[in-house]
């Protein structure tokens, strides 16, 4: 699908792709929360990464988080847990602090989840550098979407932003292979941050390199997402996805729609608590359903709804909602709080 290589079309593409990336058919959390099932489960199968991007904890604070890879037998237990949710989880997304392709068994993880239909859709976010002839065919036939984060347009730019030497031409060839073998169901989403395409020439090169390969191509603003992390790139691009000023968010939407399964089984209410401060359960000893409907989640949601987000970490210093989310529960907080209390009272009575 050939796209014109000019700034006007680039802007139009972004407006179109944002509907795919954020799903314009979104559930109104203000009217629906608390939900019976999480909409999204983030699956962190490893915390290892082959890059050290200058805006990431892997570069800024590499000694402040545990390195590890998820056990496959534990993953199968988690998948069994997912099947207990009614309605079914909308999306299982392989992502996390590490790059999923660093897990040598990642194709087995994906195949098992897809074969057992533990969610409605399956996605992976990756830098794509470890795509190869062995994993490309499997991922291309199982995933509903592969999201590739591009960090530069040549070897030198990758070194500038990720502190790693790569073979950019080989990387592009593997993306081309994936694009050719994937089925129609699978979308290849290629995105790059605006710091890497900060001129018209670079924007045109980005489209020239990847528009024919991608079903979706997107330039996103480079913003800070990690609590307590200060990048040396001066991340001041406004909102990650939309052209709108930052606004303070009192109630985090993430804790009403998602959970992350960390590599060691700890369950987090979101995907950016890289220091593992806000643990809501442990899937080694608890079911995901019990965690989702448990007292710890109720207390966390209640604190936010009561305007207490800034009284505890990492929520107090988290920039995710202001910089990256488009859902907002602030104006519906009182109504949601009443429904949360009703839900958990019913659970206690049952």
Region spans (language model):
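Conserved alpha-helical substructure of the radical SAM core
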Residues: 2-145, 157-161, 165, 169, ...
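Short loop/turn motifs at secondary-structure junctions and domain boundaries
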Residues: 35, 249-253
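Generic structural signal for small/hydrophobic residues in well-ordered secondary structure
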Residues: 41-45, 49-50, 71, 99, ...
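The −1 position to Zn-ligating cysteines in a subset of zinc-ribbon hairpins
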Residues: 48, 52, 251, 314
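Short, cysteine/histidine-rich loop/knuckle motifs that typically chelate Zn2+
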Residues: 55, 254, 317
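Conserved C-terminal portion of the radical SAM core fold
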Residues: 85-95, 114-115, 120-123, 142-152, ...
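Short, well-ordered alpha-helical microsegments
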Residues: 131-134, 199-200, 268
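C-terminal accessory region of radical SAM enzymes
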Residues: 173-176, 180-188, 210-250, 266-268, ...
């Amino acid at each position: 699908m050939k796209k014109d290589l000019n700034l006007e079309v680039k802007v139009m593409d972004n407006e179109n792709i944002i509907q795919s990336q954020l799903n314009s058919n979104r559930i109104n959390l203000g009217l629906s929360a608390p939900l019976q099932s999480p909409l999204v489960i983030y699956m962190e199968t490893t915390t290892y990464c082959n890059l050290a991007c200058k805006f990431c904890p892997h570069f800024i604070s590499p000694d402040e988080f545990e390195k590890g890879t998820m056990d496959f037998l534990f993953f199968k237990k988690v998948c069994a847990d997912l099947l207990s949710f009614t309605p079914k989880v909308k999306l299982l997304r392989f992502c996390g602090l590490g790059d999923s392709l660093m897990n040598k068994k990642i194709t087995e993880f994906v195949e098992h989840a897809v074969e057992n239909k533990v969610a409605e859709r399956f996605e992976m976010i990756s830098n794509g550098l470890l795509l190869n002839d062995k994993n490309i065919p499997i991922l291309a036939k199982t995933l509903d979407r592969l999201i590739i984060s591009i960090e530069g347009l040549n070897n030198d730019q990758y070194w500038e932003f990720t502190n790693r030497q790569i073979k950019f031409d080989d990387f592009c060839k593997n993306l081309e292979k994936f694009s050719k073998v994937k089925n129609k169901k699978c979308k290849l989403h290629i995105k790059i941050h605006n710091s890497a395409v900060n001129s018209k020439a670079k924007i045109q090169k980005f489209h020239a390199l990847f528009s024919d390969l991608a079903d979706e191509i997107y330039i996103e603003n480079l913003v800070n997402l990690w609590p307590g992390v200060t990048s040396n790139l001066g991340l001041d691009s406004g909102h990650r996805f939309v052209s709108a000023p930052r606004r303070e968010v009192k109630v985090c939407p993430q804790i009403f729609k998602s959970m992350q399964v960390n590599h060691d089984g700890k369950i987090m209410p979101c995907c950016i608590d890289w220091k593992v401060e806000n643990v809501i359960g442990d899937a080694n000893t608890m079911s995901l359903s019990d965690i989702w409907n448990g007292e710890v989640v109720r207390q966390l949601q209640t604190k936010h709804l009561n305007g207490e987000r800034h009284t505890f970490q990492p929520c107090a210093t988290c920039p995710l909602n202001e910089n990256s989310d488009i859902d907002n529960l602030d104006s519906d907080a009182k109504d949601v709080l009443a429904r949360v209390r009703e839900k958990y009272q019913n659970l206690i009575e049952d």
